[in-house]
Amino acid sequence: MSALKGHPKGLYLIFATSTAERFSYYGMRAIFILFLTQALLFDKEAAASIYGSYTGLVYLTPLIGGYIADKYWGIRRSVFWGAVMMAVGQFLMFMSASTLNNTELAHWLMYGGLGFLILGNGCFKPTVSSLVGQLYEPGDKRLDAAYTIFYMGVNVGSFAAPLICGYLGDTGDPHDFKWGFLAAGIMTLFTVVLFETQKNKYLFSPSGEAIGIIPDAKREKKEDKADHISHPKMDARTKIRNLIIITVLTAVLLAFFGYIFTGDWISVGIFTACIVFPVLILLDGSLTKIERSRIFVIYIVAFFVIFFWAAYEQAGASLTLFASERTNRDILGWEMPASWFQSFNPLFVVVLAYIMPGVWSFLNKRKMEPSSPTKQAIGLLLLSLGYLFICFGVKDAVPGVKVSMIWLTGLYLDRKSTRLNSSHCS
């Protein structure tokens, strides 16, 4: 409990803001695939494709949103407008679930809602955590505890969201999904109001300077200027060259992925953007050689992390459908909503978060702690074993017979130990 005391009040504002925003995201995710299949009557393949495209863009847009915040907007503006767009998205989802009698309108409202959620997430997610570090002096011993508190808020929101939104929306009646989306929308609106009304009271650096207003790139440039550190500049010829490179690369990738994903232009756009945007950032002439090399290393690590998150995000799609259709959820005569399984992740992380650091500390004292890449490899191995675990449980299942929830619970437990194992690398 002592670790919770002695922190700037701004940390608790960020804690509350992140808790509410993660409630919004995970609440919507808990019921989304069920809404698509049970209310909008998409077949499973189409619903999974929509979910996959949505999730892919949710992970892609922070790359752009972080760049915009760093170069132009600043963190405060990005957090505010990100939350506003997500609130609009959630209320559009509510409207979609309220107009099921008009299928075409419901579909368009759903797609519009997803668009706003994607854009809002891109602005919000990469920026809010950056505020935590700016509340403290470099090297402050309280910083580790501060990030622990911050991520605890993330887990509180992601734990409560499936329970509440699932209770309201995942009832078996397609018309009730709207209440789950409404709850998520209200929490996002709460995020907007809370952050906007309290930011000027609590978000200050130890020196008393307001944080998150000036874009980091401009602030660092001003500091470098004071320290006589120069950054390279792009001349007109370099800008034209970079424009040609990006144009040609985009055209080639669109043609290539268009051939692979015939007719699926969302996937074509996602895969193209996943390559073009990283290249575009590397071509930024204001980057120093050291900054560019660090970004390149991040890209290499990110390539392998993609496989982890591709399997991890099955929680919102195939695993939720499996929970709904193939899992016996009866508990003493009461059937647990399928969406509630998504609360197991944050529940297990709270428990295991106290175990994994001790394991690494134990190994470190004996000079046996593996390197960060090795930890990631172990994490991917554990993730694959988790899916093998559930395969063992369902391999003999016959049509019409549901399997015990112990198999899905075991998979979620393994997934969470996997995530803690990998995330500790950072």
Language model: regions and residue ranges:
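Intracellular loop-helix junctions on the cytosolic face of multi-pass helical membrane proteins
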Residues: 1-9, 138-139, 166-320, 324-330, ...
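Short amphipathic helix-loop junctions that connect adjacent transmembrane helices
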Residues: 30-46, 317-338
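Central cavity-lining transmembrane alpha-helices of secondary-active solute carriers
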Residues: 52-69, 343-356
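Hydrophobic core of transmembrane alpha-helices in multi-pass small-molecule transporters
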Residues: 103-124, 399-419
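Single conserved hydrophobic/aromatic residue that forms the stacking wall/gate
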Residues: 420-425
